[in-house]
Amino acid sequence: MLFSAIKVTMQNRLSKYFFTLTNNKNNRSFLKLDVSLQKTIRLTYILNIETSTKNCSVSVSNNGKLVGIKELNNGNYSHAEVLHPFINDVLNEANITFDKLNAIAVSKGPGSYTGLRIGVSAAKGLCFSLGIPLISINTLASLAHSISIEDGTIIPMLDARRMEVYSAIFDVNYNQIREIKAEIIDENSFLNELQNNNVYFLGDGAEKCKSLITHANAVFVDSKFPSAKEMCVLAFDKYKKNDIEDVAYFEPFYLKDFIAVPQKKKL
């Protein structure tokens, strides 16, 4: 005799899952619930912090899906003033409290020395106080994930002052195929990549390269900054792999040493 199929519903998901159970004691069996359902039995909330550029961005994700975001790019580094209010705002938007967070993810760099310090300090403080793991995200990888292409390569660039940028190269599947570099851009930059296929340049370092990189295969994507939105999937993937940092010893990836600029004397 076959019992009626039982409908299983979890976390307001639309998908329906069924199992059947036989009354034969020697052949009692059931169909396993779908793997995707098993993964949603526990909700994983991650707070994502991005402060590597002028864009101060904070998001909350649930199993890799964006459920709250707040960001501001007003041309100034106002991260110290807005970061903590933004954190409270996104938690309210996601309708959760700090104790529901499973991890904190932070953009590790490269980028602004001051911006990275602010974001990492906040992330580490939360991890210590909440007793949850810290996840670091490659800033350029996160930026690369903000666009989708069918062919060619992606070169995210972050401004490193004057004609220097922080850059890396990614393929269509977001695999990093060249290490991160601090490099001075000239008319010969990325010629090998440009000769083969389209190259998509993006980030706040790409704008100043337009006048130098004029190859027909060069495509410049406007107005792209690293955002906590793209961190959601990346952070959840690392969380599932237990790819976490030592909170006590973690430091941002500056790539270059910080050089203080002397202030001008007031007359």
Provide a role label for each language-model segment:
Residues 4, 19, 28-31:
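Short hydrophobic targeting helices and cationic amphipathic motifs
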Residues 41-42, 65, 133-226, 254, ...:
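Surface "functional belts" at beta-alpha junctions
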